[in-house]
Amino acid sequence: MVLIQEVLEIVKKRNPNEPEFLQAVTEVLESIRPGIERNKKYRDAKILERLVEPERMIQFRVPWIDDNGQIQVNRGFRVQMNSALGPYKGGLRFHPTVCASIIKFLAFEQVFKNSLTGLPMGGGKGGSDFDPKGKSDREVMRFCQSFMTELFRHVGPHTDVAE
């Protein structure tokens, strides 16, 4: 269908360096193709275009002090993908490979996972490129405190429920 291809081209143009996100969007759009083709109202309401664009993306620095007294700086992310059904809901991932593309892809998939519960929850996801492996409990605590010092401004029970 032309619409699916048009939307995929827009997504690729806007997100050229986000392979994980592009793969997830491609797979989902291809899987819902029959429903979109049968229902003109979805096309007219630009459902696909709204589905693939996050409502909000937040990227921030996370400075923290390691056990040697050295300042470390990591990146933090929160993608608030869709709140059509309720507040954003989705967990946090701390792993050295975390980047905007991965968090965006996870937030995109979280929308569908949450919608299947029947509960009024939207979809979101957050995380950081912080690697907790090999870190002391105190280092993990200091990192998490710094991470939440920024993230708390963007989450809450009626807005975004970060797990």
Residue ranges and their predicted role:
Residues 1-163:
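N-terminal ligand-binding/catalytic initiation module
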